Structures are given as structure tokens and as C-alpha cells.
Amino acid sequence: MARNKIALIGSGMIGGTLAHIAAREELGDVVLFDIAEGVAKGKALDIAEASPVFGKDSKLAGADDYAAIAGADVCIVTAGVPRKPGMSRDDLLGINLKVMKAVGEGIAKHAPDAFVICITNPLDAMVWALREFSGLPHNKVVGMAGVLDSARFRHFLADEFEVSVEDVTAFVMGGHGDTMVPLLRYSTIAGIPVPDMVKMGWSTDEKMDAIIDRTRKGGGEIVALLGTGSAFYAPAESAIDMAVSYLRDKKRILPCAAYLSGQFGQDDLYVGVPVVIGAGGVEKIVEIELNADEQTMFNNSVDSVKGLVSACKGLDPSLG
């Protein structure tokens, strides 16, 4: 049986980490693409030379020509400029929009049947633009943000309750930014709702509020600590989670920036919601019930995303 083909568009810190994980997990043969050809080829060769040590047979290659991604089953897009200290994700809009145009056209020409996962920021606007530029089906183009934001939320909750991260479930809705909506009411510790754990005296409402705030600012916290660049280990692991669910038809429920066509009262918009990912791509959107406060926060987050999409249309009239 032929191996899957994984195309990684962008060979920076996330792209290189993705390649390493994909090779170690033997998800398929890996192509690293980058306009800086030497970087893509160098990282591919470095990981390939490590493969005898970790004992896996995935083939790796690097390229600066989109023809190299031909026939890819999954494309993970990290191309673009990362954040620097003091920058918001939104500050990257103008630069990365041009990158999405080139990437979208490249995927449309060479890998039109791929499942496409976008990581480039500002995420919700970039995945929308990437879909527009590529013309691929909406269910085959999705943004990685919710899995990452939820992982951060889970980590902070596990730390606070002093339990294994394996026993913590949580998810975050809305745009990938400071208006994201971490949903405490839908978060559990081994099936016990987090608000009930608080009532039992395991923590306090004030500490939960602080964790929610830290989750919203989680990316910025790492940017400030690193000084140059942004997070790459957790984003890469999160995107691999999504790719595996697609390649193995696992039908996992994961929070992702998905296309809404009436769900949650929104239309023609990509924003973070829980979805089922299987062999058909985004197979279902899980339209959970939000209370009044949650709905207000979600609407506020959606408005922020709409503003970015409008800005994209202003920068590139072809998106109008």
C-alpha cells in the first residue's frame, strides 16, 4: 500500500517540528517546502539522517517548487512571518495575506485533493483567505488554533488541580486571539465538571478566571519569553493531532477554525468551533448550546474575526 504524503508548506520552527513528528510517527513521506530552499532541504536531510536512530522509514525531501507537493494527502501551512514581542497576531495581516495567495494557488494546482490545515496567523482570517485563494471545498480546509488553545487551557487546569493532563478535557471556542472563549462549563477533570471541582474546594473562581486569562494570552507569554519567534512544539503537536484524525478516519471531536454556514448564527466565516474530523475532512460541526454570557463572548470574538476578514478584502480586492 502506498504511503501517505504529507506536505509541509513553510520550513521554519513549526514546519521542522512537524516534519520530525510526522517522520517519527510514520504518518507518511514528508515534503518540506520553503522559498528558502536550503532550509527545507537541510531540515529534511537532518531528520532523514536521524531516522536510522529512531527506526522509522519515512522518506523526507525539501523543495522550493510547489510541484514537489503534488498529490499530497495532507498539507499543513505554516508559511508566513511569526510574531515578535509586542506584536499581536493581527499585526501580521498584510504580510501573511500575500503569502496565503501564493500558497493557495500552489495547493490548488498541485494538491487539490489534500486536507489542508492552516497555522499561519492571524489564523481565522488566514484560513478564510487560503480557502478563497485555493477554491478547495470548505470541509477540506481548516485552521489549527482550538486544539492548541485547549491544550494550554488543559495544562493550566491540570497544574492547578494537581492531576494528570490525561484526565483533563477542555476546549476553547472563537477566534485565535485575545477574544477567544475558554469554556469552563464544558471542561472536566475525569468527567467531573470543573465548576463542581471548584465547589468542592479544589480551587477558587478567582483562580479559574486567572487561568482563562492566561489561556487567552498564552501565545503572547511564549513570544515574550523567547524574544524571537513564537511557539512551535505545541502548535506542531496540535496540527499532527488533526492530521492523524483525518488520515486514520478517527472522527475525533476537536476545536478547529472551521467554515460556518449558519451554525452558531454565523455565515461565510471561519472561526473556532468543535468539529468531527474524519476521512471526509470536517464531517460535522458540533453546535453546542451556549449560555447568555458564553454567547456574548463568542459574538464578540466573531466580530473581531469579521473585522480581520474585512481588512483582508480591503487589502486584496479579489477577495471581495
Curated annotation (Swiss-Prot):
Binding site for substrate: R83, R89, N121, R152
Reaction(s) this enzyme catalyzes, per UniProt: (S)-malate + NAD(+) = oxaloacetate + NADH + H(+)
HAMAP family xref list: Malate_dehydrog_3
GO MF term set: L-lactate dehydrogenase activity; L-malate dehydrogenase (NAD+) activity
Keywords: NAD, Oxidoreductase, Tricarboxylic acid cycle
Keyword Oxidoreductase attached: yes
Annotated Pfam families: Ldh_1_C, Ldh_1_N
SUPFAM superfamilies: LDH C-terminal domain-like, NAD(P)-binding Rossmann-fold domains
Annotated source species: Maricaulis maris (strain MCS10) (Caulobacter maris)
GO process terms (BP): lactate metabolic process; tricarboxylic acid cycle
Sites where the protein binds NAD(+): G10, S11, G12, M13, I14, G15, D34, N96, I119, T120, N121
InterPro entries the UniProt entry points to: L-lactate/malate_DH, Lactate/malate_DH_C, Lactate/malate_DH_N, Lactate_DH/Glyco_Ohase_4_C, Malate_DH_type3, NAD(P)-bd_dom_sf
Protein name: Malate dehydrogenase
E.C. numbers: 1.1.1.37
Family, as annotated: Belongs to the LDH/MDH superfamily. MDH type 3 family.
Biological role: Catalyzes the reversible oxidation of malate to oxaloacetate.
Catalytic residue list: H176
Domain of life: Bacteria
